[in-house]
């Protein structure tokens, strides 16, 4: 079920109901596809794309979000290209990542030292869970970021800030131990922190862990502890479970770190699963991460730019166990599938056929939805799902909200291959949530 929720969030499509569903219907000639009329476009190619469609209004934002579908290869290249571009044009050096605070710490250690065993720590829980994140292309991108970082002056070097809820409790234990070595906490707080460390290292998560973290945070001496230590303790108190709760936890982390890390004057960028970057609520009214920012009182409000990847003809790497039998690669932990594109068979984004007519096979094309003459400033996003798909697994955009109020740019990715899975021996010990 966790994989199902993940793919609903990231790919706008479910898995398990396929045997009961027929393909999503293609648009009929009588159905207008005006949502993308008048939308300017730019081909994105090469190692250093110009991104000429980005105007000064775009660069004036503080937070830049790229929405992708995990398991597709080309977004990894786009992420690196966009990070480099924003570093050069907007001074972005803080990558707000879809990882937790512990993984962000070890990512920064890798950027500092280049030690591949440190990178192994980051990937071990993803590999143990047969996660789409455990792939060679993501790891290669991190290696490229480090090599590029070495060429930058200190004032422009990239660092990671993890906004997600805790993903790997043993790694959180290692992180806590590193924090305690770096900055000794107030003496009265040490016994409780030692107990937290012991619980984090247990084979199964203890239900008492959250309460212990709350008691540590309530200690009068905790204000003298490092901000990183307090942030880790806060994360241990968060309830885990549903995707809705996760969105709330991610936003809570941003709000806390925005103050603790003094990010008011920092430009921020990150690549996230595509549903996280939607700036308006869906029909059910529940706000995603970006929508929560827009509804908040943070100085970031109304200073967010979302760029959303949509896919045609692409292959996605998925855990084999989560796929219907006809899609599975027998005997393999991962399988590649082309069923999660946005022009069918499971979901159809109305207007995508028009955009495909304006682009070439194998291309990547940027479209500006908030251009003054674009119909997407007035017309909503419309998705059609295959018959038989449970409503609970559908993402329904509000018909009263224009497309540009959800995202300001689209990146149409055509005919990308899947990411390549890491071999099982690529990392060491197994992580645990």
Where are these regions (language model features)?
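Bacterial N-terminal signal peptides that target proteins for export
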Residues: 2-11
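Generic intrinsically disordered, low-complexity segments enriched for polar/acidic and small residues
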Residues: 13-14, 33
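Hydrophobic h-region of N-terminal signal peptides that target proteins for export
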Residues: 14-23
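Compositional signal for N-terminal targeting/processing segments
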Residues: 24-433
């Amino acid at each position: 079920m966790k994989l199902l929720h993940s793919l609903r969030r990231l790919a706008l499509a479910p898995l398990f109901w396929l045997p009961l569903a027929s393909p999503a219907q293609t648009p009929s000639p009588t159905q207008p596809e005006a949502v993308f009329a008048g939308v300017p476009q730019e081909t994105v190619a090469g190692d250093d794309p110009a991104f000429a469609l980005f105007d000064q209004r775009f660069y004036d934002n503080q937070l830049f979000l790229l929405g992708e579908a995990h398991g597709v290869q080309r977004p990894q290249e786009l992420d690196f290209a966009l990070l480099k571009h924003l570093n050069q044009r907007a001074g972005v050096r803080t990558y707000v990542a879809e990882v937790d605070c512990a993984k962000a710490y070890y990512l920064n250690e890798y950027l500092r030292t280049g030690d591949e065993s440190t990178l192994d720590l980051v990937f071990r829980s993803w590999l143990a869970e047969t996660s789409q994140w455990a792939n060679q292309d993501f790891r290669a991108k991190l290696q490229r970021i480090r090599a590029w970082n070495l060429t930058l002056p200190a004032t422009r070097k990239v660092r990671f800030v993890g906004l997600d809820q805790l993903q790997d409790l043993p790694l959180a234990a290692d992180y806590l131990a590193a924090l305690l070595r770096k900055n000794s906490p107030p003496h009265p707080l040490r016994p409780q922190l030692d107990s937290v460390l012991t619980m984090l290292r247990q084979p199964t998560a203890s239900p008492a862990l959250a309460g212990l973290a709350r008691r540590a945070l309530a200690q009068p001496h905790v204000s003298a502890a490092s901000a990183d230590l307090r942030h880790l303790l806060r994360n241990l108190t968060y309830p885990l479970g549903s995707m809705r709760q996760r969105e709330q936890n991610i936003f809570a982390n941003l709000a806390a770190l925005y103050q603790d890390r003094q990010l008011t004057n920092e430009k921020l960028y990150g690549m996230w699963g595509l549903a996280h970057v939607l700036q308006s609520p869906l029909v059910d009214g529940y706000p995603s991460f970006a929508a929560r920012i827009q509804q908040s009182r943070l100085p970031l409000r109304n200073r967010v730019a979302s760029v959303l990847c949509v896919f045609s003809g692409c292959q996605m790497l998925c855990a084999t166990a989560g796929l219907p039998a006809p899609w599975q690669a027998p005997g393999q932990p991962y399988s590649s599938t082309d069923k999660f594109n946005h022009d069918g068979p499971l979901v159809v984004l109305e207007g995508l056929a028009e955009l495909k007519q304006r682009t070439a096979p194998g291309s990547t094309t940027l479209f500006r939805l908030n251009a003054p003459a674009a119909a997407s400033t007035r017309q909503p996003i419309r998705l059609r799902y295959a018959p038989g798909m449970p409503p609970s697994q559908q993402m329904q955009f509000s018909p009263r909200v224009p497309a540009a109020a959800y995202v300001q740019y689209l990146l149409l990715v055509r005919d990308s291959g899947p990411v390549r899975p890491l071999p099982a021996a690529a990392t060491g010990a197994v992580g645990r949530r």
